[in-house]
Amino acid sequence: MSRGLGDVYKRQVGEGPFVAEKAADGEWNDKLRKAGNEFGAATGRPRRVGPFDAVASRYGLQCQNAGDIALTKLDVLSSFEKIPVITGYRVNGKLITDFPTNVLLDAAKPEVEMLDGWNCDISYCRNWNDLPENAKKYIERIEELIGHSIYLVSTGAKRDEYLLKE
């Protein structure tokens, strides 16, 4: 098994089904887009963004044959009071937790769990105990939802702004 990589939120460039975009209101997505600087490098166009999607992430990790993972961009969520997390999709009234075909993906509506944010700078955090309690709970919930351990968390944009999870 290899080590996997994932972000705490989802983004997409261009058209096509994107369930995460439907999980939060436009204001939340706009704030996320600004916090993560999610604009095209050449065009400046806003990228499509949405909260963490456990269904898509599990599928991606399966495709990577990943064991434990590095979770990036946790700092981007530091200004949010509440953070939505997609736990499943509802398609034609039925809850699904496995990534569907594109035909079903178009019709999918996200099932969302709201987690408490931490609303403070975490870029100084270099070990697990430095993180705010709600940030730890967020990471632990992600681990539960994806069925993989998180071994590293990036806490800022700089190369040395990360921690190894104990």
Go through each PLM region and give its residues.
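Short acidic (Asp/Glu) and glycine-rich catalytic loops that position anionic groups and cofactors
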Residues: Q12, K31-A41, P84, M114-I122
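C-terminal catalytic subdomain
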Residues: P17, R33-N102
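Short, hydrophobic/aliphatic alpha-helical segments
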Residues: E27-T43, Y138-E144
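Structural signal for hydrophobic packing residues in well-ordered secondary-structure cores
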Residues: K10-R11, L61-N65, E143-I150
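Internal helix-turn-beta structural module
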Residues: P84, K94-L164
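Short acidic, glycine/serine/threonine-rich loops at helix termini
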Residues: V13-A20, E81-V85, Y162-E166
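Single conserved hydrophobic/aromatic residue that forms the stacking wall/gate
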Residues: M1-Y9
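An anion-binding catalytic pocket shared by soluble metabolic enzymes
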Residues: K10-R33
